[in-house]
Amino acid sequence: IMAAIFKEFELQRMVFSEGALRLGVLYDLLGRYHHDDLREATVSQFMQRYAVDRRQAARITHSALALLRQLLPEDDPRYETEAQFLVWAARLHEIGISVAHASYHKHSAYIIANADMPGFSRMDQSRLSRVVLGHRGKLERVQAVTSEPREWLLIFCLRLAALLHRARVDTELPEVHVIAVERGFHLSVDGAWLAASPLTAAVLDEEV
């Protein structure tokens, strides 16, 4: 077999390498080119395994993407990749509830960082884990491990979307306008809606 490979590709020599490709990585890359991304299948399997509330995940995905489009136009070459990661984060951010409701975001982040997730590189998993970790609770833990602006962009979108859908019901949200500023984001929400949603308004105040 090796002789045939050398002949077919006109190879002259072979050099030993201490590195190795992860099992299945070539099939994974080939699948992405043919629009059969293994990562999508993995995310769907995790949602089923950890009994994710799919309606809530869909609500948050929709709102998080709407926020992202205000901060990163769809014609930006980075948009597709960032949007894809945001969708995965929105679908998986509650998998830790299967472990415990308390600090579930930490459990979600741990599972994502350490589980076997076919199609995802360890770097991808680490990034996804940080975004999920940052969607809730204090941000100091995330600040200690990343200063990457694009990750904070996704954290902001996921965090705000989760906050707006804290009631976990289908309801019409107000228009939300966001812009990126030098050291964070500027948020504008309809005052009448905030007055009618005092609990959400209080949580938003805590975020400022």
Predicted regions: what is each one?
Residues 1-168, 174-187, 192-195:
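Helical "lid/coupling" subdomains associated with nucleotide-phosphate turnover
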Residues 196-208:
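Short, non-transmembrane amphipathic alpha-helical segments
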